[in-house]
């Protein structure tokens, strides 16, 4: 069934490409990890910015690796540093997101083109993938999940190629050696595991075909293992150096494995304990299937499982989807972003024939009513979610930090206190503090006490979602402070809770706080983030 029924798919595809770049330059903030597990770590090392190191990089058993960060983001940052052109942190952030758009665009389109056998299938896969809000928004953000998506796609493509060779009846094709391809496959699997420990989940079922291929081509398994081991050893040595300061202990006692820092192993051990996962939130085992998957696909679910049939159920992409969702559903901590690698694979498996009333072989010149309805719902769903998650979701935090970067930290002429309330944790690297004048503190209702470092001149206090009475006491504690005191909060929260003397010095309209919406009070739905200077 052709996609070019009631519209020209090329126009929509080209518009989607443009939207990728537009949304990459928007300021939405989806999850703290997109800052704190990437640029919060790297900019401290490369630009000497004052940052906060997340627990994954600061505990005695580090759970995140430097390897993927240096591989995917450090070349950009070092290039900026070597050129010597002074870019603001905001501009650096934009460049990183544009880089992600370009990498994701090339890898995704190339893999889908090669995964699917015919032109109509390729058009369908590319069309739905490019118009999904996950592709438009999430893939430009600096998550480890974005990198995972690219690596999963390439690995699924390699396995699919090997499967095709096994199932073909062409002796010339079966006799071809795949050593180079499998070497790089092993390397990508290694990088994928160091990037996210969840990576193998998406390859569990497809790897049955890989094992079958290895059984008949044992030398290929050796090349794949070699490709896996080389980056594994390199990244372990890199992490050991970064976290321990040297690799002297390894050189002296190479067989003492306690000297090695193996971050995926530490991550696996940490996440295997429910008490650790409870610190991040526990979810029912059905959350991915019944909550996250519908939020990701929306009307696309009907393209996937209409009439409980799908002609693609034996394909490698379908097996990767089932594998990823099933394995990740066994883990009691289930966030939506964990499933974003399945999106291009799911779109390859959309089965429009199941919702078409046309008989086999009948030429379709006009889209059936149900298809037209679902297509319009698909557009509406993805446009709304792209605007919500790509523009408004916590969209004022980074611009507000950029305001302080421009007006306080570049000049370094005055003292300041920033009290952030009812926002995601502000990533300090955006402030671009190179003079070590900043102290970052976190206060909560359960832990309201803090101690200021008198050697610092600027303070960033993350009050998180504290009760407004505690925030008022926090503000009161700075009554004798000689510098400027700022409260940064959603405009709706300020209007509801505060009538103290303050002056709004800056505001950003495209900001929405979804965590403190009170549906009994429509004022809480008012978007906007403000910076208020206390008088």
Curated annotation (Swiss-Prot):
It is an enzyme of class 2 (transferase). Glycans are attached at residues 244, 276, 507. One of its GO terms (biological process) is GPI anchor biosynthetic process. One of its GO terms (molecular function) is alpha-1,2-mannosyltransferase activity. Its EC number is 2.4.1.-. It is a multi-pass membrane protein. Pathway: Glycolipid biosynthesis; glycosylphosphatidylinositol-anchor biosynthesis. GO terms for cellular component: endoplasmic reticulum membrane. The chain crosses the membrane at residues 11-31, 92-112, 142-162, 182-202, 221-241, 285-305, 312-332, 338-358, 371-391. Residues 1-10, 113-141, 203-220, 306-311, 359-370 are cytoplasmic. Keywords: Endoplasmic reticulum, Glycoprotein, Glycosyltransferase, GPI-anchor biosynthesis, Membrane, Transferase, Transmembrane, Transmembrane helix. Residues 32-91, 163-181, 242-284, 333-337, 392-535 are lumenal. Its main location: endoplasmic reticulum. The keyword Lipid metabolism does not apply. It comes from the Eukaryota. It is found in: Endoplasmic reticulum membrane. Belongs to the glycosyltransferase 22 family. PIGZ subfamily. Alpha-1,2-mannosyltransferase involved in glycosylphosphatidylinositol-anchor biosynthesis. Transfers a fourth mannose to trimannosyl-GPIs during GPI precursor assembly. The presence of a fourth mannose in GPI is essential in fungi. This is GPI mannosyltransferase 4. It comes from Debaryomyces hansenii (strain ATCC 36239 / CBS 767 / BCRC 21394 / JCM 1990 / NBRC 0083 / IGC 2968). The gene is SMP3.
């Amino acid at each position: 069934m052709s996609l070019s029924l009631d519209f020209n798919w090329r126009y929509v595809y080209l518009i989607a490409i443009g939207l990728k770049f537009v949304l990459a330059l928007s300021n939405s903030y989806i999850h703290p990890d997109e800052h704190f597990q990437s640029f919060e770590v790297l900019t401290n090392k490369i630009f000497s910015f004052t940052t906060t190191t997340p627990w994954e990089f600061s505990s005695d058993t580090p759970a995140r690796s430097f390897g993927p960060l240096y591989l995917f983001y450090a070349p950009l940052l070092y290039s900026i540093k070597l050129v010597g052109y002074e870019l603001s942190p905001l501009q650096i952030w934009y460049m990183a997101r544009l880089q992600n758009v370009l990498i994701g665009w090339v890898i995704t389109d190339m893999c889908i083109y090669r995964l699917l056998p015919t032109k109509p299938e390729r058009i369908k896969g590319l069309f739905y993938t490019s118009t999904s809000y996950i592709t438009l928004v999430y893939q430009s953000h600096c998550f480890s999940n974005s990198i995972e998506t690219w690596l999963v796609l390439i690995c699924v493509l390699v396995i699919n190629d090997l499967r095709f060779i096994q199932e073909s009846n062409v002796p010339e094709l079966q006799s071809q050696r795949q050593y180079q391809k499998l070497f790089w496959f092993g390397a990508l699997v290694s990088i994928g595991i160091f990037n996210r420990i969840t990576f193998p989940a998406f390859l569990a079922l497809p790897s049955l075909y890989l094992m079958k291929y290895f059984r008949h081509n044992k030398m290929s398994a050796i090349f794949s293992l070699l490709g896996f081991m080389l980056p594994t050893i390199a990244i372990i040595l890199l992490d050991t150096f970064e976290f321990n300061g040297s690799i002297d202990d390894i050189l002296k006692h190479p067989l003492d494995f306690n000297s090695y820092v193996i971050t995926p192993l530490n991550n696996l051990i940490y996440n295997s304990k429910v008490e650790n996962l409870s610190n991040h939130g526990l979810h029912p085992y059905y959350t991915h299937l019944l909550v996250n998957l519908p939020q990701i696909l929306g009307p696309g679910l009907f393209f996937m499982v209409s009439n409980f049939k799908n002609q693609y159920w034996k394909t490698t992409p379908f097996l990767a989807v089932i594998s990823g969702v099933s394995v990740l559903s066994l883990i009691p901590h289930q966030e939506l972003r964990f499933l974003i690698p399945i999106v291009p694979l799911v779109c390859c498996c959309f089965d429009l024939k199941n919702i078409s009333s046309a008989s086999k072989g009948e030429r379709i010149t006009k889209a059936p009513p149900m298809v037209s309805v679902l297509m319009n719902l698909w557009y509406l769903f993805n446009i709304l979610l792209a605007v919500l998650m790509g523009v408004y979701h916590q969209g004022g935090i980074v611009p507000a930090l950029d305001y302080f970067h421009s007006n306080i930290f570049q000049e370094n002429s005055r003292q300041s206190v920033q009290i952030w309330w009812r926002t995601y944790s502000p990533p300090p690297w955006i402030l671009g503090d190179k003079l070590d004048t900043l102290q970052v503190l976190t206060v909560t209702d359960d832990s309201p006490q803090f101690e200021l470092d008198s050697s610092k001149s600027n303070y960033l206090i993350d009050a998180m979602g504290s009760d407004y009475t505690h925030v008022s006491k926090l503000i009161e504690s700075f009554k004798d402070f000689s510098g400027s005191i700022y409260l940064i909060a959603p405009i709706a929260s300020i209007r509801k809770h505060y009538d103290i003397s303050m002056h709004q010095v800056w505001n950003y309209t495209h900001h929405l706080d979804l965590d403190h919406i009170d549906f009994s009070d429509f004022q809480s739905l008012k978007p906007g983030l403000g910076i208020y200077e206390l008088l």
